[in-house]
Regions:
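Short, Lys/Arg-enriched N-terminal segments with co-localized hydrophobic residues
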Residues: 6-22
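Active-site histidine-anchored catalytic micro-motif
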Residues: 23-198
Length: 198
């Protein structure tokens, strides 16, 4: 049995005060994925911008001030190293202006993107939370709203830094995440390392 340090923390939504002058400034970067998809004649296609996603989760506006930037809108199976570099550059270009970042992303290559960004943006002392969903945000049974809310809570918590995946109530270190289930909402596992938060 591995003797890892206990890193699990519990973050409560009620810890945030929407009237606080210390409300965090968060930048949301959109890259596409199932979370942003709508049904088209060609099937599910990433169509929604970050701004449109946030309209489904109005409570996020009480957590922080949010700016949005759509970098691209892709099925994540089409993400390449060039896209990782583009995301890393967007983080660098905006790093000084924001307290944290939330990246919406498809699940198929989310773990690869998280690992790549962990090395492309080394030493980050601000939270860079990557999230997505198994079902589009406009579905009745979607996991999108919970995952987005959790990602913003983590980005605002002041207890996390660096690149992490936030998914299905778990926070997983970006270099340790792996997609292990394609159908369950609990799609990601942390390999040989404890979850950072629940």
């Amino acid at each position: 049995m591995n003797n890892f340090p206990q890193l699990v923390i519990i973050i409560y939504y009620n810890d945030f005060n929407k009237d606080s002058p210390d409300m965090k400034n968060i930048l949301m970067l959109g890259t596409g994925g199932t979370i942003a998809s709508e049904m088209t004649p060609d099937g599910l296609t990433p169509e929604l911008t970050p701004q449109q996603l946030l309209r489904y989760v109005p409570a996020i506006s009480s957590l922080c001030r949010v700016d949005c930037k759509s970098l691209f809108s892709l099925d994540s199976t089409n993400i390449t190293p060039a896209h990782w570099i583009a995301v890393a550059q967007a983080l660098r270009d905006n790093y000084a202006r924001y307290d944290g970042f939330v990246i919406s992303h498809g699940t198929d290559t989310m773990a690869y993107t998280a690992a790549a960004l962990s090395y492309l943006v080394q030493g980050a002392d601000k939270p860079i939370m990557i999230t997505g969903a198994q079902k589009p945000i406009n579905y009745d049974s979607t996991d999108s709203k919970l995952n987005l809310t959790d990602a913003f809570v983590c980005a605002c918590s002041g207890q996390l830094a660096g690149v992490d995946i936030v998914f299905s109530g778990r926070v997983i270190l970006g270099t340790r995440a792996r997609k292990t289930c394609s159908k369950s909402f609990a799609a990601f596992s942390s390999i040989n390392y404890p979850d950072l938060a629940i």
